[in-house]
Amino acid sequence: TDPGLVPVDGRNTSGGRGWLGIAGAGCDVQVPFAGLGNWVVGVFGDYSFMDVHEPMQEFLFQGDAKQTDAWAVGGRVGYVVTPSLLAYTNGGYTQSHFNQVNLQAAGLGPVVGFTPANTYNGWFVGGGTEYALNFSWLPISGLFWRNEYRFSSFNKTDLQFSLPTGAPSGLAIHSQPYEQAVLSELVWRFNWH
């Protein structure tokens, strides 16, 4: 904690609710390993735009943290289990942005202060499967159904608690967000055969 600020102690673990959309790009290469050509290595990047609200409770204060966007770059290693199924693990760097949080005293009455918007840096690790949708009735080829679990851990920071006027209160809320996400998405692979 910043030596000039008094920490407001509390531990908050909550689930976010809302929606998100993802756009990404990457490149995978199938490589032989120990005589097996079923291994896949790749790099990727993705950007998530979202409106996810997470309740925040710290000591006597509560508010609603809103996560607005995130991006990640990383690598993955996978194994082609069948010609249509890839199982993989991934990891890398991530960054996410949270808006200003308006705080109320125990959730009652008017806003008594706020914490500033903040961008967090961190790392992620995850894994999942991709299944080729090789159906003759589909108008395009290279369509996959991906299911992925991703755990992200972000840096620690002290968010200064400011009064509604913007004046500093001398209090800080210690924050270290982490996130768990389960995603199911359609992926189109160009140059897939």
Regions found by a protein language model. Give the residues of each.
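Gram-negative outer-membrane beta-barrel domains
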Residues: 1-193
